[in-house]
């Protein structure tokens, strides 16, 4: 089915045969249902993954869904929100809350796509840094009744709170092979809230995306609804910035370890006492196991709200 016909007249993109761009019927119906219900103080979260692989077209599909959401909001409520790379796409987790607040205060029923630069390359490392930022974003910006799209390579890298309870669906993208052994993008499997919960529970250990059956599967066309060249340039710039940010984060972590070491050795404080004092002074949740893992170099365990 073609959607957003008024925004994409003939000549809007290469090989266009009719106004609008193609969207799978059931996917469109799902978005329409959310658009209908958003007025009753709901917000929605879509996770788009790529079976742990890269270059499968996740970003293109995410932008198409965001574009159609914006179009459908306009048609149903008469609210014409902006839809631009600057306002609606986030490349760094550190920008989520800032952009989310700005969008929520500026627009009603807006849409934000988190398409983190470098996530495809860094995998678990990238997601572990982003998880707390995503949680903080949902805490602060959940009241804005927005559509939020998390575009990530690996669904199973998410903590269970986001993967199962805080999101409405999973759209997993994959590559197929045609009759000439050529790889083709443009296919997805859609998991509803109950289905993705089963997938996470049964598939996480082996990262098995076929641990349970999807609700439906479909296709999308390789149509950029935002300027492709500008998008690629912004993402490349975001990658360069990310390298600088990562070095700063590593330096801060070394400072933190040094401070904890001084508290242990010079002041003879236990991890429990350090956690208690941090909690009291900073008014935040603090756990002794965090400091234990920090100093031993172990991976932080996922903590769900």
Language model features with spans:
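Conserved nucleotide-sensing/catalytic segment adjacent to the nucleotide-binding pocket
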Residues: 85-148
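N-terminal pre-Walker A segment at the start of P-loop NTPase domains
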Residues: 1-41
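Post-Walker A helix-loop "phosphate-sensing" segment adjacent to the P-loop in P-loop NTPases
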Residues: 67-87
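Glycine-rich phosphate-binding P-loop
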Residues: 45-70
């Amino acid at each position: 089915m073609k959607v957003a016909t008024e925004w994409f007249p003939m000549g809007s993109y290469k090989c266009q045969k009719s106004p609008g761009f193609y969207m799978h019927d059931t996917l469109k119906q799902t978005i329409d249902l959310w658009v209908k219900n958003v007025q009753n103080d709901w917000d929605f979260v879509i996770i788009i993954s790529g079976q742990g692989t890269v270059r499968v077209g996740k970003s293109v599909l995410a932008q198409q869904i965001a574009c159609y959401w914006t179009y459908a909001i306009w048609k149903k409520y008469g609210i014409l929100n902006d839809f631009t790379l600057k306002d609606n796409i986030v490349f760094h987790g550190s920008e989520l809350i800032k952009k989310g607040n700005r969008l929520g205060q500026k627009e009603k029923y807006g849409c934000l796509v988190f398409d983190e630069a470098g996530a495809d390359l860094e995998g678990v490392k990238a997601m572990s840094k982003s998880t707390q930022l995503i949680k903080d974003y949902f805490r602060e910006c959940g009241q804005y009744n927005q559509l939020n799209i998390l575009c990530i390579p690996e669904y199973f890298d998410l903590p269970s709170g986001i993967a199962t309870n805080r999101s409405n669906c999973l759209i997993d993208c994959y590559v197929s092979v045609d009759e000439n052994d050529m790889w083709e993008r443009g296919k997805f499997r859609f998991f509803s809230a109950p289905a993705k919960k089963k997938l996470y529970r049964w598939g996480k250990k082996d990262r098995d995306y076929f641990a349970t059956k999807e609700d439906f599967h479909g296709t999308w066309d390789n149509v950029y609804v935002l300027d492709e060249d500008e998008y690629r340039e912004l993402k490349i710039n975001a990658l360069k910035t990310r390298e600088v940010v990562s070095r700063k984060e590593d330096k801060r972590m070394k400072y933190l370890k040094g401070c904890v070491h001084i508290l242990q050795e010079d002041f003879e404080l236990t991890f429990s006492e350090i956690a208690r004092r941090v909690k009291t002074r900073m008014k935040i949740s603090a756990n002794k196991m965090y400091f234990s893992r920090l100093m031993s170099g172990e991976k932080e365990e996922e903590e769900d709200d």
